Amino acid sequence: MRRSALINIMVKAADKAGRQLLRDFGDVEHLTVSRKGPADFVSQADRRAETIIRDTLKEARPEFAFFGEEGGQTGPEEPEGRWICDPLDGTTNFLHGLPHWAISIALEQAGVIVAGLIFDPVKDELFWAERGHGAYLNSRPLRVTRREDLSASLFATGLPYKGRDNQDGMVASVERVSWASAGVRRAGSAALDLAYVAAGRYDGFWERGLSAWDVAAGGLIVNEAGGRVTDFEGGNRIVSDRSIIAAAPMIYDQLLQLVRPKSGA
C-alpha cells in the first residue's frame, strides 16, 4: 500500500521522536520524572518527544491544531484538522526499563478520525491506517483474528488509576473474562494493545478511563483491520465516553456481555 502524504508526515514525526525516545530509554535512570497523579508519571522523555512531534507536524501542516497529552491543545482557533498525540504511551513501562511502549498519533477532521499511527521504536513496528483504505503493519496488510471460540481467545486490558469504584468494576470484568477465555494480559500500553488486536495477536481489548490520545489512532486501526470498536454501551463515543471495547467481529458480542458494567460492578 502506498502511503499518503498525510501518513508520511505522521511517520516522519514518529520516527524523529522514536529515535529520541530510544536514546532516552538507554539513559532512563537519569531522566527527571514528575507525578501527574496516582501511578501516573511524566518524564523529560514524554515532553521531548511531544515537542518533536508537535514541531514536525506544525511545520508540515500549520493549518492543523495539535492536541497532546502533555501540552494540551495548541494551534489555530478554527483548524482544518486536529492531530491527537500521545508521545509516549506506556510511560511507567519506559521508566522501569520495560521495552513495551509506543508513540500514538491520529488526525481528526470534522469530528472524525481519518488517519492513525502507532509506532513501537523498540521493535521497529509501525501500525497505521487511513479511513477507508485498510490497516497495515509496516507494509503488510492487517486483519483481526477469525477466532470464534471465546474459550480459546486471548484478551488485553488495563486497570484505571483514578477512582476506587472504577477500578473495582474493571477488576470484576477481568475476573469474568479470565474465567471464560484463554487469558487476559495487562501489558501497560493501550495503544499497543489496540495495535495487537488489529494484528490478530489479541482477540480483543477493553478498558475504561482512557483519554482521546489513548484510543484515537488505535480505534481506527482496529476498524480498518476488520474489527469492531465501540464504547461500553455499544455506541461509537469511545473518546467522549472514555471507554472502549475492540475485538474481532466473531468475538465482540461475547466480550461485550462479559465486560459491560453490571449492577454494583
Regions found by a protein language model. Give the residues of each.
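A short, compositionally biased
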Residues: 28, 101, 129-133, 223, ...
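DPxDG-like acidic metal-binding loop motif
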Residues: 77-136, 151
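Acidic active-site catalytic centers that drive phospho-/nucleotidyl reactions
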Residues: 40, 44-46, 50, 69-70, ...
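Short secondary-structure boundary/capping segments
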Residues: 33-34, 58, 73-76, 118, ...
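Residue-level signal for inorganic ion chemistry
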Residues: 21, 46, 57, 91, ...
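Small-residue (primarily alanine) positions within well-ordered alpha-helices
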Residues: 10, 14-17, 116, 135, ...
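An extended, acidic
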Residues: 143-265
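N-terminal subdomain of lithium-sensitive/metallo-dependent phosphomonoesterases centered on the IMPase/IPPase/PAP
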Residues: 1-88, 250-257, 261-265
